[in-house]
């Protein structure tokens, strides 16, 4: 069983490296960074506690919101989804991402107090 899992993962990585555009790889690295940041914040919450609760919630909401916005950006700039987003150029999608991210972080900073 482990041989088949290893072969599936190996094939997935080979196809990912060969067929994924560089823009999407960079965005995937950003998504991984945000995911790890959110996981570390949650682990910290479990181990240490949530004494400054608003700060913890703000950081975690920022991680989750940024992850969701980045996934939406990835969907919009993926060349395979070009038919679904005909009226939206990659530059427009990135501008929308920046605007939504700015609004998200204004809310997060306001929530901290």
From Swiss-Prot:
Pathway given in the UniProt record: Protein modification; protein glycosylation
Entry's Gene Ontology BP terms: apoptotic process; protein glycosylation; protein N-linked glycosylation
Positions in the Cytoplasmic compartment: 1-30, 74-92
GO CC terms of this entry: oligosaccharyltransferase complex
Keywords: Apoptosis, Endoplasmic reticulum, Membrane, Transmembrane, Transmembrane helix
Superkingdom of origin organism: Eukaryota
Sequence ranges on the Lumenal membrane side: 52
Keyword flag Hydrolase: no
A Pfam match: DAD
Mode of membrane association: Multi-pass membrane protein
Nuclease listed as a keyword: no
UniProt-annotated location(s): Endoplasmic reticulum membrane
Transmembrane segments: 31-51, 53-73, 93-113
Protein family (similarity comment): Belongs to the DAD/OST2 family.
Subunit record text: Component of the oligosaccharyltransferase (OST) complex.
Protein purpose: Subunit of the oligosaccharyl transferase (OST) complex that catalyzes the initial transfer of a defined glycan (Glc(3)Man(9)GlcNAc(2) in eukaryotes) from the lipid carrier dolichol-pyrophosphate to an asparagine residue within an Asn-X-Ser/Thr consensus motif in nascent polypeptide chains, the first step in protein N-glycosylation. N-glycosylation occurs cotranslationally and the complex associates with the Sec61 complex at the channel-forming translocon complex that mediates protein translocation across the endoplasmic reticulum (ER). All subunits are required for a maximal enzyme activity.
Name of the featured protein: Dolichyl-diphosphooligosaccharide--protein glycosyltransferase subunit dad1
Organismal lineage: Eukaryota, Metazoa, Chordata, Craniata, Vertebrata
């Amino acid at each position: 069983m482990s041989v088949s899992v290893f072969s599936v993962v190996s094939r997935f990585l080979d196809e990912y490296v060969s067929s994924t555009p560089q823009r999407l790889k960079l965005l995937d690295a950003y998504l991984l960074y945000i995911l790890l940041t959110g996981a570390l914040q949650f682990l910290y919450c479990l181990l240490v506690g949530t004494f400054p609760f608003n700060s913890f919630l703000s950081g975690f909401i920022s991680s989750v919101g940024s992850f969701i916005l980045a996934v939406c950006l990835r969907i919009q700039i993926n060349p395979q989804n070009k038919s679904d987003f005909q009226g939206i150029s990659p530059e427009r999608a990135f501008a929308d991402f920046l605007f939504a991210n700015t609004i998200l972080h204004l809310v997060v900073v306001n929530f901290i107090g």
